[in-house]
Amino acid sequence: MGCTMSAEDRAAAERSRDIEKKLKEDGIQAAKDIKLLLLGAGESGKSTIVKQMKIIHEGGFTSEDNKQYKPVVYSNTIQSLVAIVRAMSTLNIPYGDNEREEIKSDAKIVLDVIARMEDTEPFSEELLAAMKRLWTDTGVQECFGRSNEYQLNDSAKYFLDDLDRLGSKDYMPTEQDILRTRVKTTGIVEVHFSFKNLNFKLFDVGGQRSERKKWIHCFEDVTAIIFCVAMSEYDQVLHEDETTNRMQESLKLFDNICNNKWFTDTSIILFLNKKDLFEEKIKKSSLTICFNEYTGNQTYEEAAAYIQAQFEAKNKSSSKEIYCHQTCATDTNNIQFVFDAVTDVIIANNLRGCGLY
């Protein structure tokens, strides 16, 4: 008689099965909702990754988007040239054509545009001619070659090498132009998209020190963190503190994130970004500027492996794996390939976390 189930027991068992089924369904749904946090110091390429998600997963930029980026391209280009011109006096670099008064007049034309706050306007013929003469001046080129000694946008050469196209009357930004633009992220940018039957919410938060206090409320229920590091910034200092090396700042920030109690069970993906710029820079600027104990060769492979090891060494948890990728955020194919691999890791880890893998 002890083997028979009462109606009440049967109902309880059925309720239990229903609850388990519902929990499993909820778990599967939870595993499909992916919350990604993009973290990293300022100018590490986070906002470019967000733009790539728009290109790869949301059909790219509309003609309206393109129009809105026009003034940003103009401003980035002029501001870059002005940064070089101003650095020439700081670094005591003379113009190559120093005897010619015209070159100093050209510099004044460009500086006056900034003073009048007209840097978002299309280039006048006079301004375009002045910018072209300045950019080809040997002194300006020498100063550009020392850009690690002052603050200059990574996109400076990209835009200044293409002044004729940017200065044409029918100019409209290309996808690559938009990827190269730089606008400081303030606050939090949120992007939603679907991929591999998953619903992604990607959060890009400002990387400058003043912006980091805004991160905290994004921390809850994060599936994974993508931490961006600009490999090419090993010989540069911060905008906000010119006594601090940018890569050392990134290492300190990564240490804080990687070992933070909020992220004990959070997947951490490390993007060693700007590999294209790093590959060029490492040929002429020593890694010992940042890591004075480095004794390896000045080759991309050895130097990149050393940088990766420095970041991985910050991980104090034997059970936490850091998933590392070397990236070029302005290369859509590279980011598409890397994000595909990242998504597979997220799927496996998320299902495991829900007890479904």
Swiss-Prot record:
Region (G5 motif) location: 327-332
Binding site for Mg(2+): 47, 185
Region (G3 motif) residue spans: 200-209
InterPro entries: Gprotein_alpha_I, Gprotein_alpha_su, GproteinA_insert, P-loop_NTPase
Any one Pfam family match given in the protein's UniProt record, by short name: G-alpha
G2 motif as annotated region, ranges: 177-185
Gene Ontology MF terms in the entry: G protein-coupled receptor binding; G-protein beta/gamma-subunit complex binding; GTP binding; GTPase activity; metal ion binding
Lipid-anchored residues (N-myristoyl glycine): 2
Residue stretches spanning the membrane: none
List of residues binding GTP: 40-47, 179-185, 204-208, 273-276, 329
Signal peptide region: none
Keywords: GTP-binding, Lipoprotein, Magnesium, Metal-binding, Myristate, Nucleotide-binding, Palmitate, Transducer
CDD domains: G-alpha
Lipidation (S-palmitoyl cysteine): 3
GO CC annotations on file: cytoplasm; heterotrimeric G-protein complex
Record-level GO BP terms: adenylate cyclase-modulating G protein-coupled receptor signaling pathway
Ranges where the record places region G1 motif: 35-48
Chain ranges of the G-alpha domain: 32-357
Complex formation: G proteins are composed of 3 units; alpha, beta and gamma. The alpha chain contains the guanine nucleotide binding site.
Function, as annotated: Guanine nucleotide-binding proteins (G proteins) are involved as modulators or transducers in various transmembrane signaling systems. The G(o) protein function is not clear.
Protein family: Belongs to the G-alpha family. G(i/o/t/z) subfamily.
Protein name (Swiss-Prot/TrEMBL): Guanine nucleotide-binding protein G(o) subunit alpha
Organism from which the protein derives: Mizuhopecten yessoensis (Japanese scallop)
